[in-house]
Amino acid sequence: HVAEACDAVAREQGWSPQDIDLAWLCGLLHDMGRFEQLRRWDTFKDAESMSHAALGVEVLFGETPADAPAATSIRDFIDDPVEDELIRASIAYHSDFRLPAQLDERTRRFCDIVRDGDKIDIMRTIADSTVDTILKVNEDAFLASHFSAPTLAAFAEHRCVARDERDEPADYL
């Protein structure tokens, strides 16, 4: 779904055919680290393992672990290495709270599109799921919850709520 969202947004923004294809590829590969994360730690939670984004970069651009069931490389997906750094950045930073300030404009555009595609997919997943599945609380507990002070402060400051600031089920809206 993320690859499709990246493709659609890139087309809507009038990107070149080559950049549309590259946006699609970045969206496809953004969660490549999830497979290795599940294999090594039996979890999809970064807090209980390591950043799945960093792990994705390791899987695609690094050495294949000796105990890995198969070798995967960025060359399996694209022959020309000219866009490797842009692809690496779009994968590495897609789950970061903020993008690094020093990114060039083109790399930032690709990072933004992958992050936005990922958010669209997360919202689709949430819309198709129950409160209990997503937040591990029943609907009554969710409806009885309120926004915490840190969440209200983040809203007033026009910024995202950090994970460690979320205390109440409502904070996850």
What are these language model-derived features?
Residues 14-25, 67-92, 106-113:
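Acidic/histidine metal-binding catalytic segments
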